[in-house]
């Protein structure tokens, strides 16, 4: 059985255990003081999957990267408008003298980034539009080299890897 741990603020949906998974949900302010405190505790529980409701600060982002580097599947949310900008947002949280190391860590631990938005549709409702960047060797090299515009071009050309842009 997979152990899934969520850290949320607030918990928006209560998940039930299944025969394949055990799900523990932690709510910031109710069960823990912060995302980073909950994430540090989560690493001691050895979950298979960690969902972080929002990666807001340096400590949470550092711990998320550490969790990914140690074999956990980490899913987290950031408020950004594209996959390329998500990488920049992660790296920019680090002090300038640590950003090169952060790019290296992200380039080796990242599986992919999905950026999503809701757009008005022709029926008056809203539809999901998304961008997907998969961390291929080329994307990893561009992350390490800090080549943002080239990463976007690689996403445009990466449909054989499942990548797509918002356009």
Model feature map: region roles:
Residues 1-167:
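Short, flexible helix-loop junctions that flank or precede catalytic/ligand sites
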């Amino acid at each position: 059985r997979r152990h899934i741990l969520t850290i949320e603020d607030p918990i928006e949906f209560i998940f039930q255990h299944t025969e394949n998974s055990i799900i523990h949900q932690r709510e910031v302010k109710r069960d823990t003081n912060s995302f980073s405190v909950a994430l540090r505790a989560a690493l001691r529980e050895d979950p298979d999957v960690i969902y972080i409701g929002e990666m807001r600060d340096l400590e949470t982002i550092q711990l998320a990267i550490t969790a990914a580097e140690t074999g956990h599947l980490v899913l987290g949310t950031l408020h950004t408008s594209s996959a390329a900008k998500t990488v920049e947002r992660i790296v920019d949280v680090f002090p300038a003298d640590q950003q090169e190391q952060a790019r290296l860590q992200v380039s080796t631990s990242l599986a992919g980034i999905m950026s999503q938005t809701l757009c008005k549709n022709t029926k008056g409702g809203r539809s999901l539009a998304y961008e997907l960047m998969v961390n291929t060797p080329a994307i990893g090299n561009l992350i390490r080299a800090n080549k943002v515009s080239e990463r976007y071009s690689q996403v445009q050309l990466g449909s054989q890897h499942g990548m797509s842009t918002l356009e």
